[in-house]
Amino acid sequence: MTEVKSKETRAPSSARDGAVLLQAPPSRGEAEGIDVALDGLLYPRSSDEEEEEEENEEEEEEEEPQQREEEEEEEEEDRDCPSYRPGGGSLSKDCLDSVLDTFLAPAAHAAPWSLFGPEVPEVPVAPMSRGPEQKAVDAGPGAPGPSQPRPGAPLWPGADSLNVAVKARPGPEDASENRAPGLPGAEERGFPERDAGPGEGGLAPAAAASPAAVEPGAGQDYLHVPILPLNSAFLASRTRQLLDVEAAYDGSAFGPRSSPSVPAADLAEYGYPPPDGKEGPFAYGEFQSALKIKEEGVGLPAAPPPFLGAKAAPADFAQPPRAGQEPSLECVLYKAEPPLLPGAYGPPAAPDSLPSTSAAPPGLYSPLGLNGHHQALGFPAAVLKEGLPQLCPPYLGYVRPDTETSQSSQYSFESLPQKICLICGDEASGCHYGVLTCGSCKVFFKRAMEGQHNYLCAGRNDCIVDKIRRKNCPACRLRKCCQAGMVLGGRKFKKLNKMKVVRTLDVALQQPAVLQDETQSLTQRLSFSPNQEIPFVPPMISVLRGIEPEVVYAGYDNTKPETPSSLLTSLNHLCERQLLCVVKWSKLLPGFRNLHIDDQITLIQYSWMSLMVFAMGWRSYKHVSGQMLYFAPDLILNEQRMKESSFYSLCLSMWQLPQEFVRLQVSQEEFLCMKALLLLNTIPLEGLRSQSQFDEMRTSYIRELVKAIGLRQKGVVANSQRFYQLTKLMDSMHDLVKQLHLFCLNTFLQSRALSVEFPEMMSEVIAAQLPKILAGMVKPLLFHKK
């Protein structure tokens, strides 16, 4: 009765509903340390441990039973010791406290070292050796709760205080089910049960404990390591397991509870990150309320821990309150050898060690050296980055994922992204001609552009180009090279190529694999220059620049006296060579091969004159500033030679074109888009067979012209005016080309009388199409109405 009264006089703590403060006996001479390992959380190492690791595992297993027997004998001697004062509580209460003392007392200390900043402050704390008088004083209205210790209380030698928040039991039936038959209940152990109150059935907040005072010895430091906040159900259940198991091992008549152990993978679900994303109470070394554990020893467990009556899940418990103070968990650790997880990775854990909250074995993680100390971090990557964003951010990238599938992914955390050829998907060897490609596609593009190859697709211009089938259709392969933005002169921009390689690696880090249909979007990203030394060029314009034909020579002999017939004959041969270049250029033009083959032939026959005159005007503008007509490098007509020719009026009409280029200062990008639109500038009256594809293609090149205008002009008004001027220039080409067609047809009809030669191809085109064009059987596409 005396013992019951002394317990009733103690007021229950108001720090947490359903929480019971576990106190130690009044006095202890010495306490033995038992291995407590946080498997998968922290594995600090010291110099003593490195020496002990060299011992054989068999010797450690033989020493374990002897140490356990010695611990039990010393605990029995402590109960019979004269220094033991039974007035501090009942016998069962003292047994319970002795169990806690045994788990919490270290036997020695390892070499000191610190990891995460400042040492743990030395704050006096209420010892576990307080008597009932002190407990009664604490129960007063003005006395601090268990979370606020008395600074003047004497310290219990060789141990720290432990405040554990235990889940309140919902009722007698649940309490009887959760403990083994014959085991004493909460009242029999020496402390009363508390009502759950409004929070019955919920979780008691974890570890609202007082800051534990640490009294280091001479030259002794403490490892102050913040770890994940744990669910209160985990702490409460683990506390009950520790109490019951130790009571069974202390020689009681009741055997240990036979409960299936919970896999370590399930325990990781009990940790939860801070609710509001703010910095936790353990950031920057601040000292907050925490659970502190000191342990020392090296040993391999031999039996699985009996933990929880049944396999628990987070859904079985209510979520802890998030509005109040965030629960925290700190640990002061010394030598602790991580026991292997049960299963395929090694022997099961012992009942003396805390279960791990990591789902991966420590062997999967590479050791980290922080501040000169060798340590292995075993936190799961997902939980660590969500729960502890403020914990050493520079080192979070070294934490491996806790699953095998993530480690076997295409791009592991220690490997560089693979460079993929944008043409065939093979491994790229570098940035060739402005695009990241392999060596095979590099050589193919160079030979195709420098040679006189005329590739034709045997299918529908949609052949698959990959590593295996890239040699099947060179036409589709070359078209894909041009669409990707390969330019034969791109190798001159070495600085741009280096920038493209860097950006390609950045794109590969964000997207592990580049799909074939994403080539254009990726090319657009690669074409951007951050330093603005090389202006941004849209990918389509880059393709147009790459397929632009080279300059063709007329083969005119300037040493001979010039006659009207010889000049016209030279111009006809030059037109035939340029017509071949137009055919080759049109095949490489993006979208043109998607049209019907008859439509392709018709468009070339209707527009060849426009394309050749427009290109001649551009050469005159670029090479001679519009002062002469630059037909070819070996055939340039100045004003005097124009007057001496038989077509001086036509020369004056053609001369206006380069002068307009000079007045408008047309850029190369604008010229390339306008030239592509001139190919699509005239159609038959009845329309084309693939009219819808034609309209879509023409619309796309009009958009490209707008983009080209936007490269130089700033503002909507300026862009609109520029677009109006350029489209008016293209509309004026119809009148100029009509005059040239009429002169060409008349010369062709009178070729024998004028002694003018016409090549075979030119003769066929003129005889078949010029009469239809001059008869008005075609439809010119105008941007503006006359």
Curated annotation (Swiss-Prot):
The free-text tissue note of the record is: Oviduct and bursa of Fabricius.
Question: Where does the record place Low complexity bias?
Answer: 203-212
Q: Which SUPFAM superfamilies match?
A: Glucocorticoid receptor-like (DNA-binding domain), Nuclear receptor ligand-binding domain
- Zinc finger spans (NR C4-type) are 421-441, 457-481
Which GO terms label this protein's molecular function in UniProt?
ATPase binding; chromatin DNA binding; DNA-binding transcription activator activity, RNA polymerase II-specific; enzyme binding; estrogen response element binding; Hsp70 protein binding; Hsp90 protein binding; identical protein binding
Query: Would you identify the family this protein belongs to, as annotated?
Result: Belongs to the nuclear hormone receptor family. NR3 subfamily.
What's the protein called, per UniProt? Progesterone receptor
Native source organism of the sequence: Gallus gallus
Q: What is the lineage of its organism?
A: Eukaryota, Metazoa, Chordata, Craniata, Vertebrata
Q: Which gene encodes it?
A: PGR
